[in-house]
A protein has these predicted regions:
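Short, glycine-biased loop/turn motifs at secondary-structure junctions and
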Residues: 1-146
């Protein structure tokens, strides 16, 4: 098992898999999820060194993973969090545990085995941008006119 809590010994239950993916999708599209994603993008863009670590929230040198970047931005004391406790991390960041697990999976496991911290930063930033819901200007204009 990994920090994400995902396991490789899937029992083939498509229904449970669909339920899990549905929870992840709802978490990412919800108000709290979108707020975290926007904060994450801002935190990533503000990083002086465009590098993301894996397997930890923050190192003693101050390097962070994707969720850790939000922790720095929001002033979360990450030394008190167990990076392998999805529920605890989710609570500290006001997101669903399914979202915490998915971000950790993307950060730690979705990239190539020999991925550099710089490449991880680039991949995660692109992924975060694809998950942020944008409202077309025309939709905002139509609402304010009507």
């Amino acid at each position: 098992m990994s920090r994400s809590g995902y396991v490789e010994d899937w029992d083939g239950d498509d229904w449970q898999y669909a339920l899990c993916r549905g929870r992840v999708a709802r978490a990412f599209k919800g108000k709290r999820g979108q707020a975290l994603l926007k904060d994450m993008l801002a935190a990533l863009d503000a990083m002086p060194e465009k590098r993301l670590i894996a397997h930890e929230l923050e190192t003693s040198e101050g390097a962070v993973c994707a969720i850790g970047s939000v922790g720095k931005l929001r002033g979360v004391d990450m030394s008190k969090l167990d990076p392998e406790d999805a529920e605890g991390v989710a609570g500290a960041f006001d997101i669903a545990p399914s979202m915490a697990r998915e971000i950790v999976y993307e950060n730690d496991e979705a990239g190539p085995h020999n991925e550099t911290p710089e490449d991880r930063y680039t991949r995660i930033r692109k992924w975060i941008m694809s998950e942020i819901i944008t409202v077309p200007v025309s939709a905002v204009t139509e609402r304010s006119d009507g």
